[in-house]
Amino acid sequence: MANRLLLLAAFLVAALPSQAQFFTGLRGTPYAGITNVNYSPAIAGSPWMVDINVIAIGANVNNNYVGLSRYALFHSSAFSDTNFQQNYLHERVNGLAKSGYAGLQVQGPLSFMFQFGPKNKRTLNAIAFSYHGNFISNVDNVTEVLARTAYHGLGYDANNITHYVNTELSNANLSIKSAAWIDYGITYSRVVINRRENQLKVGGTLKLLQPVSGAYGYVKNLSYKWTEYEQLNIYNTQVNYAYNNGMITSQGNSDIPAYVKQGLQFKNGPPTVAVDLGAVYEWRPDATKPNHEMDCKCIEAEQVQRYKIAAGFAIMDFGALRFKRGDYSRNFTADIRNWDVGGADFPDGLQSIDDTIQSRFKVQPGKKYFTVWLPTRFNLFVDYNIWKDFSVNFTALISQDMSPKRDMLHQVTTFSVIPRYEIKWFGAYVPLSVDVMGNVGLGLTLRAGPLIIGTQDLLGLFVKKHLYNADIHAGLKINIPYHRTCPKNGDIRFSKKG
């Protein structure tokens, strides 16, 4: 039983919210192009005439409870240690509820953007098409007593730590949700104001959503008591429970390729839509000042378009996924006494859980479909050009489960300061970030020609004793910049000094 509960704890950690921004270092920079369409759809004004994605992937996990020893990260033999938990895992005990996140996003090949406009306003409009494979899993609001009891396993050791036996316990708003989906988006952005030193650009993305897999569970008020080490009472607790039809289980589809194919054919749920909206203001105090003396030098497009301060706001992923409910996934009321969970066994995975629910609890009739809301978030940034090619970006990602039923996916509210150096074919970005779960990260992203690679946190690799979060992102693109604007014969650009 202790081993099963340890696996449960490991699942909570792996599925638990993180610093879940993808490509954090590129947020706010105009050089991100199509990569930033997931941060703000206001992409007009980019230095790139055309930006085509070959492949881009971002993955991260994070939790605020169990840390992995940095030693184990670099020594695979540690994972075969019979005392792995004691030697290489570390609990963060602070009395707070435990949460975590796992996320993956892949921007599909040939996602692209291009800009067009009059000769003297070549970046007036931008159009993009992009598609992404997405996966997010959240576990939220696990009380420290429940988390530690699961981590140490029912019995003397856990009780000696948490004193869970013969104690009236509760857990409010406990939730777990997970979804995989594909989105196909068309983006339009335009510079709507361009007067002297002031520029305002806006953008929007309309997305078609393809649900692949989804599940959630939510307990508003869990009330329970352990009368013995492995004997449980649960008191009149309402549980919302759903997973999509065809979920991989002995009662559904055990053929993974067939299951994925079913999802891609909209058999797991109908298509729905979502929208992104964004705006960026730029202040260019030098826009009306002559900046070229009597010469015939060509002017780089990005030199003409440089701003001193930019500020942006976007609301992303406003929409929801709809799934066909599995036949055995129903809301239920748990009200049971003296349940010997030590003898509980789940040999058939999800089917065994369903069988237990059907036999022990009062199951309620369910609707044919259930909803999982997308991770709606608010992105804000202020970007300041310090000097020439050196800038610093202040960004906030605000995301939380705002649904009363706790069926909304979410990222983790994170605040970042990102110093950077960038020119057309190279950029170095150093994000310093802190999230609401108390995790601090110092990362590095490099952009070298068409290649982007980085991580949100290098501290875990070189400084931190234990890792609570990990992130990696990489991309390969085809960038086509604007050609230089050069004077023609008889068109000599000059201005007087002063």
Give the location of each predicted region:
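Bacterial Sec-dependent N-terminal signal peptides
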Residues: 1-25, 498
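Subset of outer-membrane beta-barrel
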Residues: 21-498
